[in-house]
Structure formats: structure tokens, C-alpha cells
UniProtKB/Swiss-Prot annotation:
Gene3D superfamilies: Viral capsid, core domain supefamily, Hepatitis B virus. The lineage of its organism: Viruses, Riboviria, Pararnavirae, Artverviricota, Revtraviricetes. It is found in: Virion; Host cytoplasm. This is Capsid protein. It comes from Hepatitis B virus genotype D subtype ayw (isolate Italy/CI/1992) (HBV-D). The keyword Phosphoprotein applies.
């Protein structure tokens, strides 16, 4: 069976594979982050979101994998075999869990669309030959797309002040909702 754990979230294993393995924090750091940010929601019997559910499952599976690794460590007497098993788990399974945990924590933190846009932008950047791409990789942030970054060396253009507008004589309208109350 070819199961892609990211498909229902609009991403793919291939899309995450563009990020180098050293990009992802350690499983321990990711578990600490998930616990610090989302412990209450993860331990709640209530359904919060598909990302919370996926994160719960990944955390439980990692715990089971560590139980198995401990068992193997205790029961495999051949040190070379034990080292091979530990190396395989850390290299292959560890990376998959680091990717999975990072993806769902990032989606909860930044929003799914932002994370998908980042993965696509990074994928385009990494596949562009170095001579034709910007020196710095895209970064995952919450800054809006409309942020303008000025080039160094140029002085900013002086703007002429705009003429003052006449205020209307009618009373000011109030907004029906404040920005903070919107989700």
C-alpha cells in the first residue's frame, strides 16, 4: 500500500523531501515544542483539528517505537546488530517522525496554507541551479506577502506629502467588529 500521511493536508512526502534532513529539529525538541504549545489540546478528549489528531497519533507511535527500541537494545546481544538497528531507526524512522511532527506543529503554529506555500517555495528554490537562485532559502514566517524589502545602497525615495483631505460633516462610522475578534 502506498500511503502518504500528508495527502489529506494538501502536501506530499515528496514535497517534504525537498527539505534537507538536518532542517528538522530532533524528535525530543519537537515533542517538547508540541507539549509546550499544545499540551492541553492534545490531552483533551475533545476533537480540536485533524492536525491535533495526527500529532497525537505520531506521538503515540513514537512512544511505541521507543519501547521497541529499548526491547531490542536489551534483548539483542550482538553489539554490531544492536548498533545497526539503532542506526536504522534513527536514520530512517527518526527522520520520518521528525518530518511528521514538524509538519503538524508548523501547520498549527503558522497555518496550513502558509506551510504549504513555504514547502512549494523551498522546493522551487532548491531545484533552481545555484547560479540562478537567490543566495538565501525562503523562510517560514508569519510575515505577510506584501512586505517590501528595500535593496541595500539605495536611499529611500522622498515622498511628497499628500494634501489633507477635508473631513466630511457626517458622524464617523464605527466598525461592527474589531480585528482581534475575528478568527
Amino acid at each position: 500500500m502506498d500511503i502518504d500521511p500528508y495527502k489529506e493536508f494538501g502536501a506530499t512526502v515528496e514535497l517534504l523531501s525537498f527539505l534537507p534532513s538536518d532542517f528538522f529539529p530532533s524528535v525530543r525538541d519537537l515533542l517538547d515544542t508540541a507539549s509546550a504549545l499544545y499540551r492541553e489540546a492534545l490531552e483533551s478528549p475533545e476533537h480540536c483539528s485533524p492536525h491535533h489528531t495526527a500529532l497525537r497519533q505520531a506521538i503515540l507511535c513514537w512512544g511505541e517505537l521507543m519501547t521497541l527500541a529499548t526491547w531490542v537494545g536489551v534483548n539483542l546481544e550482538d553489539p554490531a546488530s544492536r548498533d545497526l538497528v539503532v542506526s536504522y531507526v534513527n536514520t530512517n524512522m527518526g527522520l520520518k517522525f521528525r518530518q511528521l511532527l514538524w509538519f503538524h506543529i508548523s501547520c498549527l503554529t503558522f497555518g496550513r496554507e502558509t506551510v504549504i506555500e513555504y514547502l512549494v517555495a523551498f522546493g522551487v528554490w532548491i531545484r533552481t541551479p545555484p547560479a540562478y537562485r537567490p543566495p538565501n532559502a525562503p523562510i517560514l514566517s508569519t510575515l505577510p506577502e506584501t512586505t517590501v524589502v528595500r535593496r541595500r545602497g539605495r536611499s529611500p525615495r522622498r515622498r511628497t506629502p499628500s494634501p489633507r483631505r477635508r473631513r466630511s460633516q457626517s458622524p464617523r462610522r464605527r466598525r461592527s467588529q474589531s480585528r482581534e475578534s475575528q478568527c
